[in-house]
Swiss-Prot record:
Top-level lineage group: Bacteria
Species of origin: Crocosphaera subtropica (strain ATCC 51142 / BH68) (Cyanothece sp. (strain ATCC 51142))
Cofactor: Zn(2+)
Cross-referenced PANTHER family: FORMAMIDOPYRIMIDINE-DNA GLYCOSYLASE
HAMAP family (alphabetical): Fapy_DNA_glycosyl
Species classification: Bacteria, Bacillati, Cyanobacteriota, Cyanophyceae, Oscillatoriophycideae
Gene (UniProt): mutM
Keywords carried by this UniProt record: DNA damage, DNA repair, DNA-binding, Glycosidase, Hydrolase, Lyase, Metal-binding, Multifunctional enzyme, Zinc, Zinc-finger
Protein name: Formamidopyrimidine-DNA glycosylase
Pfam families: Fapy_DNA_glyco (PF01149), H2TH (PF06831), zf-FPG_IleRS (PF06827)
Cofactor binding notes: Binds 1 zinc ion per subunit.
Residues that span the membrane, as ranges: none
Amino acid sequence: MPELPEVETVCRGLNQLTFGQTIRGGKVLLPRTLAYPVSIEEFLEQINNATFGQWQRRGKYLLVPLEEKKGWLGVHLRMTGQLLWVKQNEPLSRHTRLRLFCDRSKELRFVDIRTFGKVWWVPPNQPPETIITGLQKLGLEPFSNAFSLDYFIDKLKGRQRNIKTILLDQSVVAGIGNIYADEALFKSGIRPTTLGKELSQPQVKRLREAMIEVLKTAIEEGGTTFSDFRGVTGINGNYSGVAWVYGRHNQPCRVCGTPIERIKLGGRSSHFCPQCQPLGNKK
């Protein structure tokens, strides 16, 4: 699933290419892609002749205000969603779910192999979270000033779950997923099986700083492409080439040379270095 860096990469690409573009019609090729409204006719009627404002990212959601008081569009890429800015005569992928036609023979396509992705239209004068209810459950953004050490310590205090699972909880920190949880835990020297309540203040401080550093690096690299993620122009992300542990099972640790191990936690694969992330380390 695209995580914060991938969604941020898409957001920045959309702002470069679609800001000020006007929607001149569209086609919904898979009706269940629409989360709201479910009526294809109403959706297309409401967005027709609307102009894209500045795209925003909230957690793993993409939001854009539509000028001319046309409301908002919201998108969640889920597992395999892609937003691609292409020429209208570009060959159509069989996984294309939505087409929004714009000026100069361009269009914004939503391509989604697994079909879990969702698109919302939010009526004017309504906050997006009233329609896209998942927004209400999100925790702080890791780049926000409010994501302080005190906030993070408070969120981990007394927690009986392992730290990897906690980091994946979107109500704690918005946008972190499997890849960057593993990477941040490696950078901070914390084993993913460590319980939240067992972390010392220096460890929490290190983890917070590592999360921010890893996310910034991943954004600079255009995100991670292991299978389906693409930027708005179809370009792959490059972070996998510099990843510390994720996707590197049995390969030597980039720091100490110890083979990277992989275990299952909460149904997800977790990668770590047993040497650099020792059990019971409180420092």
